[in-house]
Curated annotation (Swiss-Prot):
This is Cytochrome c-type biogenesis protein CcmE. It is a single-pass type II membrane protein. It comes from Maricaulis maris (strain MCS10). It is found in: Cell inner membrane. The chain crosses the membrane at residues 9-29. Residues 1-8 are cytoplasmic. Residues 30-158 are periplasmic. One of its GO terms (cellular component) is plasma membrane. Heme chaperone required for the biogenesis of c-type cytochromes. Transiently binds heme delivered by CcmC and transfers the heme to apo-cytochromes in a process facilitated by CcmF and CcmH. Keywords: Cell inner membrane, Cell membrane, Cytochrome c-type biogenesis, Heme, Iron, Membrane, Metal-binding, Signal-anchor, Transmembrane, Transmembrane helix. Belongs to the CcmE/CycJ family. Its main location: membrane. Residues 139-158 are annotated as: Disordered. The gene is ccmE.
């Protein structure tokens, strides 16, 4: 029969193991839910790999929108320094057009083309997603008003 002290020690050890496993599973779930934002220049400097789900923001390059062999829409996102090829098989937003700011979310295929699952276009002529504006500012091509991007002057658009 196990003495009282040994039984308490076994209970504490089992509780610690359960806690470590729970924290580990929680961190794994959180990591799979996180989507990092990149500019085309950041991707050129440090490619995130083909397994990573990412967001890329920038401007749709003029005269880059076309149809891929698969029937998907193919276009290029630029920050005026580097470019990222994108393919998207869904319906594009009504405000999607060349020269317009976009944020796409997806994964890179083995051929280096970003396979987008979602495409978000800016919703009016004054809004620029803060991540996109910051990436353009860092690339030295920000053409917006003032030092900080705003969501159409409404303070916080969330």
């Amino acid at each position: 029969m196990m003495r009282h002290r040994n039984r308490r020690l076994a209970t504490i050890a089992a509780s610690a193991i359960v806690l470590v496993v729970a924290v580990g599973l929680g961190l794994m779930a959180l990591r799979s839910a996180v989507v990092f934002f990149y500019s085309p220049s950041e991707i050129a400097a440090e490619h995130p790999g083909i397994e990573a789900r990412i967001r890329v923001g920038g401007l749709v390059l003029e005269e880059s929108v076309g149809e891929a062999a698969s029937g998907a829409t193919r276009f290029v996102i630029t920050d005026r320094v580097e470019n990222v090829q994108v393919e998207y098989a869904g319906l594009l937003p009504d405000l999607f057009r060349e020269g317009q700011g976009v944020v796409v979310e997806g994964r890179f295929a083995a051929d280096g083309v970003l396979q987008a699952r979602t495409v978000l276009a800016k919703h009016d002529e004054t809004y620029m997603p803060p991540e996109v504006a910051e990436a353009l500012r860092e690339a030295g091509v920000w053409q917006g008003e003032g030092e900080t991007p705003s969501a159409a002057g409404d303070g916080d658009s969330r």
